[in-house]
């Protein structure tokens, strides 16, 4: 350590006052040597009561032999203030490199913070740029300021004039300079306010560009005993350079050579950059840094040299250990320590063991940080890999999306052209299909109308002749009674009337301009119908004889099984129909398979739905495809003859292709909101039902059992696809009921007296035929039991037909017990499955009570016959047949009575 007496070193920077422990250090009367522009003067210890202020201008003047300026403070406070003031931007202080600095002789040893050559070299070796720091009064380093000093404001300069008056011992060598500085002093309060304002404005300014040689950042107020106002006043003159016409601030001496200063500053910057590069290279070579703080007995200094702490500093809170050096512009930690006076303790001067510990500790810290950095690098690498993978996936997805978009565009363009072509195609072919459909409908209507007209003409021929004959016979019988002679007379009258009517019905010869008889064809048709009637009568007689011999209800009677169709009409109808179907097969023959084949069209739309379902849905294709597929279905349904063929839709090609249209490929069922599931039902409703409706209304022969059976099958088929709420289906049911009502109204069953049947020829055959026709109609009505409601059937078959027209005929022939029993059996057989038979309960057979009463009437007739002594095999056979009728009607009690009455050996 050096001498213990207080040393006064020249200071540079915003340091505090010069009072240390109550003592005031004053400058010596004369300097010991002349320093360069970058080195401060050293003070002698011979004048303890005076202090010399150092400025760059003073130093230059000293080099040139100019007299120096001394300050004579009046009191301790003034001396403290004057020792801490700096020159403003007009000062020529510069930070030069170490080589340019000339050594100055000093009467003291280099202390901590001094500008000795050894200290600066050690500082350059171990320390990078250090932040701004404030040293204590004990250290008092010599600092060279550079940069511009913000000039004080005019009002501040005016207020500083009062300070000049308080400084009475200022002695400048040049009177002009003394007068200039006397005007630059201000009062203390104004200086404090200006200092606070500038410190607030310069907080964002960069750190000082000089190297502090203090022993660390020290709280000068606590160490030196400087007041808060003095501490706030320190560093007030740091700021931008004032303008040329501005007045100089406190201690602001004129700068007569600014260009030289700027050149020096630029060289300083270059030297600093070179020193920084050298320092960085040296640090990389060393591999480890120097610790600036070690343990509780060392503190961090601005020059990288550890300074021991005073014993009274041990009570301060322990600061976090800093790294080896502070970067330029980075503020130092707020560590307040008091450096000791004496030579600095360098890391290199420590024992080897301590240096090894420091190096080991630094190495461990570096390894720890390296591991942390490695972990962060690995984490960053992992995230980078993840991001790269995600990016690659995104790129792949985008490429796939782009390729899919391209495929979609191509597909949509082709599909647009396809739909455009197929719409035009269907518009052209649709007229041909409609023409063939109209011709097919016309053919069916003609075929049905020919049968109906022939039946009506035949009935009219018979009824006209029989009507006249019956009327003549009834006239004779009503006048003369029922004797055999009267019956013979009635027969003669009937024949005469019949012959007369036949002659009137014969068409006379009517020649046209070419000599052809226009009525010849009509007469031939009448003759053909008469011959057909004769054949039917002959068949009836044969069946009646067989019924007398055969004991059973299975034998049908005349009129019950006749279809009223001629072989010639049937063959002509089939020939014309086949030619129309051949024309239909050639409708699409001139088109390519892409448009003419339903399977190709279906596959095209199914691919659209499968690959681009959203666009398929947005285009409302579920509402459009029925219209597109409809021509193909209509063309195939031309072959569908629902009245003459019992064909299921499953046997048709269009149904097999469109039944699973739009169904998922995985075999799952349709989605609830997929309207393509209703494609086939919609086609059935819009295409098939209209065809069937036309056949029912215009072509159905209700008396034909075969056509009725096929019509029932076709109606049942369409009801399986279409809901009951369908309007088309409701219209179909209404048409069926209307046709049945019309048929019941058109039929008539004669109720002639038995005497008339005996007297008038052919009346029994006609009555039997009409009865057989009514039974046939009743049986055809009962075929609709699974389609029409039971009350509707009951009203049609029972109320209107059975009770209104059939039973009166049976009652009229009751005296002819054989015919009456036979016809009753046919009635019960026609109602089987609906109101009669083993599968029907008694509840359903109750509406047949009139038929039961008629059967009981026949039983009483047989009982009378048995009571008259006619107990023959015929009577027993009729009784047995009545018993079976009652069993079918669920009248078992009456059946048992017949068994007991006629001694039948049969169980009921």
From Swiss-Prot:
Molecular function per GO: DNA binding; translation repressor activity
Knockout or disruption consequences: Reduction of polyploidy and inhibition of hypocotyl elongation.
GO cellular component: nucleus
Keywords associated with the record: Coiled coil, Nucleus, Repressor, Transcription, Transcription regulation
Region span, Disordered: 1-113, 238-277, 513-574
Location relative to the cell: Nucleus
Principal subcellular localisation of the protein: nucleus
Compositionally biased residues, Basic and acidic residues: 513-530
Domain of life: Eukaryota
Subunit field text: Interacts with STIPL1/NTR1.
Domain comment as written in the entry: The C-terminal region (474-908) is responsible for the repressor activity.
Protein name in the entry: Transcriptional repressor ILP1
Organism field: Arabidopsis thaliana (Mouse-ear cress)
Name of the gene encoding the protein in the UniProt record: ILP1
